[in-house]
């Protein structure tokens, strides 16, 4: 019997043994699902061997190809195996529980195509949320408000998202986007097809890079990716680029007391 649930975990510069998502998944019975690891690491962390030991599928391992290429490679692999069912996407640092899969198994029976959990950070619901045309997010004040919302401008982060694999009969992630905005762009495309986002009665507590202060060097690299991705996303909407990316550049300039962020802003436009 073919498994109806595939789990995709994208790991970046760490071993699967140290990945919170992989650690949590090992504690959950998963004989009824197949697990794919896409390794975006820039050096060998022994993840291929780890996957072989656990009967997981290992893909990637040729450097950081970006998130969209990672997802598309996994989708193409599943296509080749004639997979039909649902695919779940996870970062490598998601606090995963069995409750998620129990809720998802029941939700899959409805035939709906996209499911997302509630994702909390610092006591706030960060996902799902609403999003404007300028990619400004509007948080829901409560789970009840999120569950009752009927608008088409709802969005969510990738980690924890479950998708009917039928979505990928005529869709792939845009590989011009390396990392930032992939989730929002994807769900806007789905909304245009009248595909509704359904919310699971499950809660994750997720660690976000924005919750900490990295070194200036790391912040510059990270902002460079953000600016380049949104320069592409907003290539036909320059005011949105200046609003979203400019606002972040100004904040980082003040935070690090460096004009280098403004230089990246101007160079990426």
Where are these predicted regions, by residue range?
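A short, conserved alpha-helix in the catalytic core of glycosyltransferases
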Residues: 155-161, 166-171, 176-201
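A conserved acidic beta->alpha catalytic loop
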Residues: 16, 37-47, 63, 94
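Short beta-strand-to-loop element that shapes/binds the nucleotide-sugar donor at the catalytic cleft/hinge
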Residues: 115-131
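Short, flexible, basic/aromatic active-site loop/helix in glycosyltransferases
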Residues: 132-154
